Regions:
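Extended, small-residue-rich solenoid/repeat segments and analogous flexible loops
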Residues: 1-36, 42
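Acidic, low-complexity/disordered tracts enriched in E/D and polar residues
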Residues: 162-201, 222-223, 227-229
Length: 229
């Protein structure tokens, strides 16, 4: 998670919220209990406040921002889909903003309403409660099916909070002088390492430029046979 104070504006993030690695939360931002902000999302409260209500989710690559006089207010149990933009708008409880949709300053999305993927809701437009808006520019077309995504994402965020952990990727290593000596079949070091299962085979792979997993590189590093490139 990357959370930043901007001047005198500081994010307030509930301890039970989930902020994925690589997401950015900046300035006057309030994140409610059980809310989630996913990978590569940006929530920027530098010019005006941004509020994300309890149980809401801001999915991967989405952007929330606001202009002076137009706060970005996301109600409880709202879904903001992948790469969607909500800019200075109000999104009421249970609504869904589809993938790649854009909602502009002063717009209001009613309770349990749905903005379809790729739709552009123009400045000041209102989408009534429980209705579906589609198109560029958006038009209200019919009643929306119940969104329901927020509950699923809240459960997923709880799993991520417990189960997400970084892992080391395979990397290439160069042979040290000691490592080069170890590949000399007449050296004492080579004869000793022959008795250690797999060490010389792994060393040869490193010499050929193959990436090594952390676990297989460790004994070679301890022996001083290889060094990171």
């Amino acid at each position: 998670m990357s959370a930043y104070r901007f001047e005198d504006k500081t994010p307030r993030i509930h301890p039970q919220a989930f902020i994925a690695p690589g997401a950015y939360v900046v300035g006057e931002v309030e994140v409610g209990e059980g809310a989630s902000i996913w990978f590569a999302a940006v929530v920027r409260g530098d010019l005006e406040r941004v509020v994300i209500g309890p149980g809401s989710n801001v999915q991967d690559g989405a952007v929330l921002h606001a202009d002076p006089g137009f706060p970005c207010l996301i109600g409880p149990s709202v879904t903001v889909g992948h790469r969607a933009i909500v800019h200075g708008a109000v999104v009421e409880e249970g609504a869904l903003i589809g993938m790649g949709a854009i909602v502009l300053n002063g717009a209001r999305i009613g309770k349990n309403a749905v903005v379809g993927a790729g739709t552009v809701v123009t400045a000041g437009m209102e989408v009534p409660e429980g209705m579906l808006a589609l198109g560029v520019p958006a038009r209200v077309v019919r009643p929306a099916p119940p969104p329901g995504n927020a509950t699923r994402y809240r459960a997923l965020a709880e799993r991520y909070a417990k189960g997400l952990s970084p892992m080391a990727l395979p990397r290439r290593y160069r042979l040290t002088l000691r490592g080069q000596d170890a590949l000399n079949p007449f050296s004492e070091l080579h004869l000793r390492l022959k008795r250690e299962k797999g060490v010389l085979e792994t060393l040869r792979r490193a010499a050929q430029g193959f990436p090594l997993e952390e676990e297989e590189a460790r004994p070679l590093l301890l022996e001083g046979l290889i060094a990171p490139e």
